Each structure stands twice: as structure tokens, then as C-alpha cells.
């Protein structure tokens, strides 16, 4: 599947917020030289007033880039979220949070979601004792996600676990850093997730 391979900071500047595409070793503001709120390009300093559609599109692009998902797959997630009972926007975020690559990132086994996706694809992750190499695999409540035994010596995983101590720990996950494994304890609630995401704009966009 095609993936964006260009500068990660440019995407964060495009959306005007940290998309958590980098490891976090250095503050993103220092990398952008305090220009995070300035869009890339010659006319980046000019902030056009967005229409309702423009705001909806930007929000969708922001969330899609945070989770590293292409448009077609993102739309499929929306369709599934709309089919489920409850709030469509919240359902969408829950589905995205349940992706195996995202869970691996949240548990601290990878410094970024892109790195987590690579670990999964390279068969370094097991779910309930079985190797799963599909990044989009949906993790269920009580599933045990762990680093494969022969991958536990990887320096990048150890470094990621060290970095994870500086991040807020998700309350819906239980992680044993020493064993390099964790449990998906419960489905995250909206209050558990980023307040910087306005999922209602995405619902409005796709509802047209």
C-alpha cells in the first residue's frame, strides 16, 4: 500500500498541530523553529479563512495523517463506524484506536505509529501468542499484545519503551514493560482520547 514518504514535520505544519509522527526525542517546536502554526510553502504565513467544507476537510486530513491511513481505508472506517450503534464520530475514533499498529504504539513498543506498523509487518508482534502481521488488525478487549520473543533484543524497542515513560499512559491499556507485553483492558471512551480532534467535522464531511 502506498505511503507518504516525505518530510513528517511538513504534515504537522500543514495541519497546524503536532501529529505525533516523530519520536518525541526533541520537542516538535524546536524542530520547526516555532513555526508549527505556519503552513509549509512560499505563502505559508498567509492563513486563508476556511469555509465549512475546508474546515471539515482539514480535520479529516489531520486525523487520517495521525493514524497513517490512506483515504480509501479511512472512508471504510467511517462506513463501519456509521453502521455501528452509537455516536458515529466516537465509533470512528474507537476503531482507529483499536488498530494493532496503534495499540503497539500506545503500549510504548514503538516510538511512532509508522514504526509500530513496521514492527507488525515484520512479524515482531504477537496477539494472544500468535504472530499477527496485519497493521489494521482490530484488537479486542482482553487481547494480550506482546513483542515476539526473538524481537525483544531490538534496540529500537527498548529505546521506545524508555521514551514511553515520558508520555501519558492510556488508562484502557495495561502494560508490563519488563515482559514487553500488554493487555487491551477495555474500549477507550471519548474522554480518554485527544480533545484536539473534532470528529463531528468528519461526520459532517462524509454525511454530505
Curated annotation (Swiss-Prot):
Gene expressing this chain: rpsD
Pfam families: Ribosomal_S4, S4
Lineage summary: Bacteria, Pseudomonadati, Pseudomonadota, Gammaproteobacteria, Pasteurellales
Matches recorded under Gene3D superfamilies: Ribosomal Protein S4 Delta 41, Chain A, domain 1 (1.10.1050.10), RNA-binding S4 domain (3.10.290.10)
Sequence ranges assigned to domain S4 RNA-binding in this UniProt record: 98-158
Subunit structure: Part of the 30S ribosomal subunit. Contacts protein S5. The interaction surface between S4 and S5 is involved in control of translational fidelity.
An MF annotation (GO) of this entry: rRNA binding
Keyword Translocase part of the UniProt annotation: no
HAMAP family documented for this protein: Ribosomal_uS4_B
Entry keywords, A to Z: Ribonucleoprotein, Ribosomal protein, RNA-binding, rRNA-binding
One Gene Ontology cellular component: small ribosomal subunit
Family the UniProt entry places it in: Belongs to the universal ribosomal protein uS4 family.
One BP annotation, GO: ribosomal small subunit biogenesis
Function: One of the primary rRNA binding proteins, it binds directly to 16S rRNA where it nucleates assembly of the body of the 30S subunit.
Protein name: Small ribosomal subunit protein uS4
Amino acid at each position: 500500500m502506498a505511503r507518504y514518504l516525505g518530510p513528517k514535520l511538513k504534515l504537522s505544519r500543514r495541519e497546524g498541530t503536532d501529529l505525533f509522527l516523530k519520536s518525541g526525542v526533541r520537542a516538535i517546536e524546536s524542530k520547526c523553529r516555532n513555526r508549527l502554526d505556519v503552513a509549509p510553502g512560499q505563502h505559508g504565513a498567509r492563513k486563508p479563512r476556511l469555509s465549512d467544507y475546508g474546515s471539515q476537510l482539514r480535520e479529516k486530513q489531520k486525523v487520517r495523517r495521525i493514524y497513517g491511513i490512506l483515504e480509501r481505508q479511512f472512508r471504510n472506517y467511517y462506513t463501519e463506524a456509521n453502521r455501528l450503534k452509537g455516536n458515529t464520530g466516537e465509533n470512528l475514533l474507537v476503531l482507529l484506536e483499536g488498530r494493532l499498529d496503534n495499540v503497539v504504539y500506545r503500549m510504548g513498543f514503538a516510538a511512532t505509529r509508522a514504526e509500530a506498523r513496521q514492527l507488525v509487518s515484520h512479524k515482531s508482534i504477537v496477539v494472544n501468542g500468535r504472530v499477527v502481521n496485519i497493521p489494521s488488525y482490530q484488537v479486542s478487549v482482553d487481547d494480550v499484545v506482546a513483542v515476539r520473543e526473538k524481537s525483544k533484543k531490538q534496540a529500537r524497542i527498548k529505546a521506545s519503551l524508555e521514551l514511553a515513560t515520558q508520555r501519558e499512559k492510556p488508562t484502557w491499556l495495561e502494560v508490563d514493560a519488563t515482559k514487553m507485553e500488554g493487555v487491551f483492558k477495555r474500549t477507550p471512551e471519548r474522554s480518554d482520547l485527544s480533545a484536539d480532534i473534532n470528529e463531528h467535522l468528519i461526520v459532517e464531511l462524509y454525511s454530505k
